């Protein structure tokens, strides 16, 4: 007992002696004041709670071996939301256990390693979560974390739910005091990020083209990049002397890009594609790099998304274009079932310089679907091939390659990938249970917008009366995944607009996904009422991507030129749009309009588009209008497929187009019939690059405009000029009569 009292006395004395670590228990807004008193080795413990609308500015100084630590009382127990951000500056600060969830950054990044003009050195952000910290619009750009200063560390953090423009984590080299920084970015989990649809959605960027030849000395290791699909560059290195090692890239639609800068080391990383579209590996630009001992499995991306892409260069290139690849070592790497290893990637009339002095040695390439180990886009006399092993679908006879039966690697499971990476406590909320789907049955005259607003995720709204009248005075706003359909196969229920103020008939808002079947949308102006703006459109401010499926619907009698049947608005993005078996007739505006991004910076409104077995009749605007302007190469979409559609008396004005397709990177127009359409201009106006995969085949052009292609190489199959023989055009049945020439050729709509 005496010994216990003595121990307590000694502890009490130690608590007030100089140099002994202290603990401060405070609320989140009180941290800044506590920092003015705290010193090396002290702990500031923040009470649990939900904190909102705080611009936190933390300055303090610890010491080597005795950092000043600011931590949540319970990891994850301090939740920071609303309009909040964190700025930290000083030296030897350690921030641990905080969760930023569901908020937005008021200005700049969510977390920055600087406060005003003062930067942070030797500071650490650990065991933190930033999840769903997005603005209201996806084109409002900011990052989750920006590193300034030197020798800072970001580790064991989880970064999730980023939907807006902007790099997730940036290493800045804009000043000398942030160069040669020796930052560490390790053991983090970069959780799924969907395709953004333009440049500027990288997961990590180190430097910029202006600092390409400055040494950063940043170490990126032991991170998990899981389905980071924002753009082609998952990790974008734009500086020199960095190390990227032992990371896992899991089903990420993009690459580790050595975009600018020299002498970077890429070693012992694992890339797992599992055959997912656009999964990529390593892209090389500039000089002096080493790419060694990496494992790439099931990577199927092409061109800039290849498993390995060694780029061609621009003569006398400016730093922000493509400098010569030279003096590069690519050794001891394993490629299993990877579809594209490319040398001379990007060769065109600008990028004309092939790589020089590249050593490709002791690599192993296994893919029984290939007959050659690599694709030579340009000459390869600048490569030295030595001691490589291959197991292909045919015997390889190239010098420097030996046919063998190799040992295949064992890959980590998803649980093993996540172990030790990210905040240990973090569990995505994606798996939370939702109520069982319900069906809402509506009769003619019922309040359809109100029913849609009441519906929960996965519900179905059924319009029960065949040919029934369903007037709407405001938009049906879809905020959850929802199906709206007719009850049966009789006459389509008719939705018509009777509002006092113009509005959409259906608006897909944040969180919404729509499947709509068997509905007719009438744009006829009701006496004393306003016109509908669009049949189906999107909210002006959206952050989340959405899907839209339209089947067996009719859009008719929209009588104003700016009023469209289906439209994606600016700064909204659809992952998938499918429009099948539908009729568009008597429209003054466009029928299908995904052309709102007009800044020519590579942005577009929908990634995958399928338009199949649809009829278009008497369309004054463009039946199909899809736009991706500019020459940006950081995305893979849009993918556009138009199959078995019929166009009768469409867009015959001077310089008009039935289809205007600007910048689709994958396009197939097949089995379509153009009749008395595009006479004043084009049936198809296509603006494509030489490397984009476009195909127009098996189409009929009867008394219709020509096909105008930028490259002149878009037509890949036969075209014909046969007069259509429709089943019942007076009742808008534009299928070909059985036995007619076009029916035999399977051109035009089908039953």
Give the location of each predicted region.
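Bacterial N-terminal signal peptides that target proteins for export
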Residues: 1-8
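Acidic Gly/Asp/Thr-rich repetitive segments characteristic of extracellular carbohydrate-active
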Residues: 21-53, 57, 432-469, 738-749
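Glycine- and acidic/polar-rich repeat regions and solenoidal domains
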Residues: 55-57, 82-87, 101-121, 130-400, ...
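C-terminal accessory segments
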Residues: 322, 402-426, 435, 462, ...
């Amino acid at each position: 007992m005496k010994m216990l009292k003595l121990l307590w006395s000694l502890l009490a004395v130690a608590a007030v002696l100089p140099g002994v670590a202290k603990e401060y228990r405070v609320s989140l807004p009180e941290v800044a004041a506590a920092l003015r008193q705290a010193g090396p080795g002290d702990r500031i413990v923040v009470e649990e709670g939900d904190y909102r609308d705080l611009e936190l500015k933390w300055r303090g100084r610890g010491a080597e071996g005795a950092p000043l630590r600011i931590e949540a009382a319970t990891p994850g127990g301090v939740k920071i939301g609303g309009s909040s951000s964190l700025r930290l500056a000083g030296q030897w600060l350690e921030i641990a256990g905080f969760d930023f969830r569901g908020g937005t950054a008021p200005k700049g990044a969510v977390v920055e390693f600087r406060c005003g003009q003062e930067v942070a050195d030797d500071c650490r952000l650990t065991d933190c979560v930033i999840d769903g910290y997005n603005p209201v619009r996806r084109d409002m750009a900011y990052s989750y974390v920006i590193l300034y200063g030197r020798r800072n560390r970001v580790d064991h953090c989880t970064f999730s739910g980023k939907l807006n423009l902007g790099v997730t984590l940036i290493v800045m080299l804009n000043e000398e005091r942030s160069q040669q920084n020796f930052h560490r970015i390790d053991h983090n989990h970069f959780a799924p990020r969907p395709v953004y649809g333009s440049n500027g959605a990288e997961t990590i960027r180190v430097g910029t083209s202006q600092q390409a030849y400055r040494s950063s000395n940043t170490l990126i290791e032991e991170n998990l990049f899981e389905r980071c699909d924002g753009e082609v560059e998952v990790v974008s290195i734009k500086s020199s002397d960095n190390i990227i090692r032992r990371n896992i890239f899991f089903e990420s639609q993009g690459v580790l890009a050595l975009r600018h800068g020299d002498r970077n080391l890429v070693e012992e990383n694992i890339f797992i594609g599992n055959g997912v579209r656009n999964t990529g590996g390593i892209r090389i630009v500039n000089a002096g790099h080493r790419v060694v001992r990496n494992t790439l499995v099931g990577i199927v991306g092409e061109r800039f998304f290849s498993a390995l892409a060694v780029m061609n260069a621009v003569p006398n290139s400016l730093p922000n274009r493509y400098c010569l690849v030279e003096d590069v070592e690519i050794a001891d790497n394993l490629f299993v079932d990877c579809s594209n290893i490319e040398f001379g990637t990007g060769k065109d009339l600008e990028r004309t310089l092939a790589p020089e002095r590249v050593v490709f040695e002791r690599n192993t390439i296994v893919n029984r679907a290939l007959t050659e180990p690599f694709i030579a886009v340009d000459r390869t006399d600048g490569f030295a091939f030595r001691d490589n092993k291959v197991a292909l679908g045919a015997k390889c006879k190239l010098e420097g390659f030996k046919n063998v039966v190799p040992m295949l690697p064992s890959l980590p499971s998803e649980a093993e990938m996540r172990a030790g990476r990210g905040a240990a406590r973090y569990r995505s909320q994606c798996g939370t249970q939702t109520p069982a789907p319900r069906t809402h049955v509506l009769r003619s005259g019922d309040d359809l917008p109100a029913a849609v607003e009441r519906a929960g995720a996965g519900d179905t709204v059924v319009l029960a009366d065949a040919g029934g009248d369903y007037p709407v005075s405001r938009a049906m706003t879809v905020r959850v995944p929802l199906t709206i359909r007719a009850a049966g196969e009789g006459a389509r229920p008719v939705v018509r607009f009777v509002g006092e103020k113009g509005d959409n008939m259906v608006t897909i808002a944040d969180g919404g996904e729509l499947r709509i079947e068997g509905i007719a949308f009438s744009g006829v102006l009701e006496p004393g009422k306003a016109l509908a703006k669009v049949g189906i459109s999107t909210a002006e401010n959206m952050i989340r991507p959405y899907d839209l499926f339209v089947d067996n619907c009719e859009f008719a009698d929209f009588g104003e030129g700016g009023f469209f049947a289906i439209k994606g608005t600016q700064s909204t993005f659809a992952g998938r749009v499918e429009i099948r078996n539908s009729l568009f007739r008597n429209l003054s505006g466009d029928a299908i309009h995904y052309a709102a991004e007009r800044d020519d910076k590579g942005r577009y409104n929908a990634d995958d588009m399928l338009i199949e077995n649809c009829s278009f009749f008497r369309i004054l605007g463009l039946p199909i209008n899809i736009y991706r302007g500019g020459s940006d190469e950081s995305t893979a979409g849009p993918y556009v497929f138009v199959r078995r559609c019929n166009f009768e008396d469409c867009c015959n004005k001077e310089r008009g187009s039935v289809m205007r397709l600007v910048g689709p990177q994958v396009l197939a127009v097949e089995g379509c019939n153009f009749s008395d359409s595009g006479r004043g201009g084009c049936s198809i106006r296509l603006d494509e690059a030489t490397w984009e995969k476009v195909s127009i085949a098996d189409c009929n052009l009867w008394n219709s405009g020509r096909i105008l292609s930028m490259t002149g190489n878009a037509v890949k199959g036969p075209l014909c000029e046969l007069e259509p023989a429709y089943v019942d055009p007076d009742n808008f049945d534009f299928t070909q009569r059985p036995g007619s020439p076009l029916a035999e050729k399977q051109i035009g709509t089908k039953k």
